[in-house]
């Protein structure tokens, strides 16, 4: 159910938090978008469409989750042509969505907020690393990340194109601890806090790959990696973090 927008009124802005189960970790961002849009159409909610020829659904997503990562804190803003009871809307979306991407929370938000992708600039991550080698341990990984931070920039390839990312602002903080041994493998649990900007976003897998190439982890091998995004926030100029579904930003 949809309706073409004729002007620029403040249509109800329904913000939905959803997860991306590990089973769908390798689902790309475009596939996530298409899956959500199909779920919205099946839900029967009166979504708004733009004025362009293609009549695209008016929906905005938070920053793309890297392929290979799961999440329990993704968001989209869906613009409706009429306000429905928030519980009714949430249940309709939940019923029409795959269980591995089911909505977790929903609320109507202030209409004049910036687009999600630009507004949510801080992320928190958990990574579980499994590797081999006597030097594969939390203290060595901590040394590797410290060396990279002092280096300032890491260079990597995305496809066949060289890329670089500056760590001074994008890598906010981290902690590493040794986890339970898994047979002959050693494991590390890593938490990361990152910041994105117009200059780019730091992907955990890129940082971890760069760390494995440092002297601190020489002679070790990373055998498997699981990454989970655990949170996203807006960062104010004074460093205060604002939740995407902050009560202060909700409409009653």
Regions found by a protein language model. Give the residues of each.
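Short, charge-patterned binding micro-sites
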Residues: 23, 48-80
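Core RNA-modification/binding signature centered on pseudouridine synthases
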Residues: 8-11, 26, 147-252
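Ordered, amphipathic secondary-structure segments that act as subunit-interaction surfaces
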Residues: 72-126
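Extended, well-folded interaction surfaces typified by the phenylalanyl-tRNA synthetase beta subunit core
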Residues: 12, 17-19, 23, 27, ...
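Helix N-cap motif at beta-to-alpha junctions
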Residues: 81-86, 132-135, 197
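Charged, low-complexity intrinsically disordered regulatory segments in eukaryotic signaling
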Residues: 1-9
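Short amphipathic alpha-helices in soluble, non-transmembrane regions
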Residues: 88-97, 137-149, 207-208
């Amino acid at each position: 159910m949809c309706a073409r927008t004729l002007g620029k009124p403040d249509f109800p802005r329904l913000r939905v938090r959803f997860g991306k189960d590990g089973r769908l970790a390798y689902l790309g961002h475009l596939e996530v978008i298409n899956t959500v849009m199909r779920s919205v159409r099946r839900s029967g909610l009166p979504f708004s469409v733009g004025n362009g020829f293609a009549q695209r659904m008016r929906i905005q997503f938070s920053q793309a989750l890297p392929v290979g990562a799961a999440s329990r804190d993704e968001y989209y803003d869906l613009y409706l042509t009429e306000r429905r009871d928030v519980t009714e809307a949430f249940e309709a979306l939940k019923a029409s969505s795959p269980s591995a991407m089911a909505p977790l929370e929903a609320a109507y938000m202030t209409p004049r907020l910036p687009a999600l992708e630009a507004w949510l600039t801080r992320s928190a991550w958990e990574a579980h690393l499994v590797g081999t080698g006597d030097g594969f341990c939390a203290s060595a990984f901590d040394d590797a990340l410290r060396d990279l931070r002092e280096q300032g920039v890491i260079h990597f390839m995305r496809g066949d194109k060289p890329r670089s990312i500056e760590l001074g602002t994008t890598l906010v903080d981290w902690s590493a601890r040794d986890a339970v041994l898994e047979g002959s493998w050693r494991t590390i649990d890593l938490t990361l806090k990152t910041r994105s900007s117009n200059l780019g976003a730091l992907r955990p897998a890129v940082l971890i790959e760069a760390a494995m190439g440092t002297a601190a982890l020489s002679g070790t091998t990373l055998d498997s990696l699981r990454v989970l995004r655990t949170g996203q926030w807006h960062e104010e100029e004074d460093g205060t973090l604002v939740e995407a579904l902050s009560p202060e930003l909700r409409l009653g």
